[in-house]
């Protein structure tokens, strides 16, 4: 299956490829249909872990994950979405498998299952608007993406043009998920460090050619928030070089790592270097 470069669909695709031990290009629509039993169980286990319990409302508020009582289970809900495929153009993957006019309103695709899709034709939580063309396969993969999510102040995901990065990122997250679920991990007092998770991934490379975007989002309540940080390629390669020269800890002591996400590293780096040089000169004068 080709990537859509939608952050949720792509992360779900890599998660599925991880559990099926396949390359993403070898994933078929039949694989997605056949995976629903397995992946529904994985998601239920994941959100039942206290450490990650907030993610279900931050990602899929008003869904079968957050309101299971009296409604279909997540498994049944996803199976129902698959049955409501059509032959209209999907605005995410470009395939002709979407269906807008669905008789059973329970299976209209809205924000409860598809974060960050905003349009005049897209269903909101109250389902009083016309639907946007999104196929059920993209919806199912979007639900799977929760397994790659982490929480800082917001839920967040990475997306990259680098296939290697996405595979490494997914593998790292899923291994951590497995351990946390088995141990019944509790909520952490300190929020997950977004920059540190990036460092641990990219520093295994000798160089990095792709681009990385970080999506921070909250899809709870009647409004949704999303912020996209584009992480410059040169910043990623700088982290790699600092790691090679054992300077990464010094870099972080100057609190320069936080400027990677907002794209202002150069100016703040020069300011810190100037400050250090100035302090060194003052020390030299005092010693004279």
Q: At which residue positions do the language-model features occur?
A:
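Intrinsically disordered, low-complexity regulatory regions
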Residues: 180-288
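Hydrophobic transmembrane signal anchors and adjacent membrane-proximal interface regions, especially
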Residues: 5-7, 130, 171, 226-228, ...
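Helix N-terminus capping/helix-initiation residues
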Residues: 28, 135, 262-263
């Amino acid at each position: 299956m080709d990537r859509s470069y939608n952050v949720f669909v792509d992360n779900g695709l890599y998660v599925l490829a991880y559990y099926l031990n396949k390359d993403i290009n070898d994933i078929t629509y039949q694989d997605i249909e056949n995976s629903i039993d397995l992946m529904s169980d994985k998601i239920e286990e994941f959100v039942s872990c206290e450490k990650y319990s907030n993610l279900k409302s931050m990602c899929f508020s008003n869904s079968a994950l957050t309101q299971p009582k009296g409604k279909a289970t997540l498994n049944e809900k996803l199976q129902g979405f698959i049955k409501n495929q059509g032959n209209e153009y999907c605005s995410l993957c470009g395939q002709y498998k979407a269906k807008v006019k669905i008789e059973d309103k329970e299976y209209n695709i809205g924000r409860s299952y598809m974060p960050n899709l905003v349009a005049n034709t897209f269903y909101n939580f109250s389902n009083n608007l016309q639907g946007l063309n999104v196929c059920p396969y993209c919806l199912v993969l979007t639900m799977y993406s929760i397994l790659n999510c982490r929480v800082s102040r917001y839920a967040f995901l990475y997306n990259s043009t680098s296939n290697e990065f996405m595979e490494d990122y997914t593998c790292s997250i899923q291994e951590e998920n497995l351990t946390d679920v088995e141990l019944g991990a509790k909520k952490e007092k300190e929020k997950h460090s977004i920059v540190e998770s990036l460092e641990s991934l990219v520093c295994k490379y000798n160089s990095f050619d792709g681009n990385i975007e970080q999506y921070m989002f909250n899809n709870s309540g009647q409004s949704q928030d999303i912020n996209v940080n584009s992480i410059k390629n040169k910043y990623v390669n700088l982290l790699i070089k600092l790691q090679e020269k054992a300077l990464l800890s010094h870099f972080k002591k100057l609190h320069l790592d936080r400027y990677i996400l907002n794209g202002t590293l150069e100016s703040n780096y020069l300011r810190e270097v100037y400050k250090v040089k100035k302090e060194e000169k003052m020390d030299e004068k005092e010693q004279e």
